[in-house]
Design a protein with these regions (language model features):
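Conserved donor-binding/catalytic loop of nucleotide-activated donor transferases
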Residues: 77-79, 97-101
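Donor nucleotide-activated moiety binding/catalytic core segment of transferases
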Residues: 50-90
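Short hydrophobic beta-strand element within catalytic cores of glycosyltransferases
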Residues: 84, 101-104
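Active-site donor-nucleotide binding/catalytic segment of nucleotide-sugar enzymes
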Residues: 1-45
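Acidic, divalent-metal-coordinating active-site segment for phosphoryl/phosphodiester hydrolysis
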Residues: 90-97
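Hydrophobic/aromatic ligand-binding patch that stacks against planar heteroaromatic rings
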Residues: 27, 75, 94
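Leloir-type glycosyltransferase catalytic cores
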Residues: 120-169
């Protein structure tokens, strides 16, 4: 679970943070997997403290505890399911680059700019992400395949080609 925080028009209440952690924990228990956490500069310290109280975080990357942004590529590699709060296109992009379909988590209160919502819609249209509300995390199932590496690679190549074409003009 990659956690951001309030930003770009996404706002999380204290109860939503608690529900997010509890529902993610339930999801992991149902699937008999170990929860791993990655926090960011915007993740409230209280949320990180709650995670440390409830879970073994020896494999997690916790920003406030480590006082730095740790590397987490290895966690994306070993993760069976990648959940990311939807408040950061950078975090979503990093997760998608793993080649695994990403579950983007959103709060009830969103007032993001239209341009940002278009990014989310594009990722959804490319089937890189599946959106999920906080209250439905524990019930989440993928409607389609989870290995999207070929689609991610193809999208990357198309983007590179379009950049080269623009530079020629």
């Amino acid at each position: 679970l990659i956690l951001g925080g309030d930003g770009i028009g996404y706002f999380y209440s204290k109860s939503e943070w608690l529900d997010l952690i509890n529902n993610f924990s339930s999801f992991c228990k149902l699937r008999q997997t170990n929860p791993l956490f990655i926090t960011s500069t915007r993740t409230p310290i209280e949320v990180e403290e709650l995670i440390k109280e409830k879970f073994d975080v020896s494999m997690s990357v916790l920003y406030h505890s480590e006082k730095a942004r740790g590397k987490f590529d290895h966690l994306l590699y070993v993760a069976d399911n990648i959940f990311v709060t939807e408040d950061s296109s950078t975090m979503l992009s990093e997760a998608v680059s793993s080649g695994k379909k990403v579950i983007s988590i959103f709060p009830q209160n969103i007032n993001a700019p239209e341009k940002y919502l278009q990014i989310i819609t594009k990722y959804q249209g490319l089937e890189f992400i599946e959106r999920c509300s906080i209250e439905n995390i524990d019930k989440f199932t993928f409607p389609r395949e989870t290995n999207i590496q070929d689609r991610v690679d193809s999208s990357r190549k198309n983007f590179q080609r379009s950049l080269v074409e623009r530079l020629k003009d």
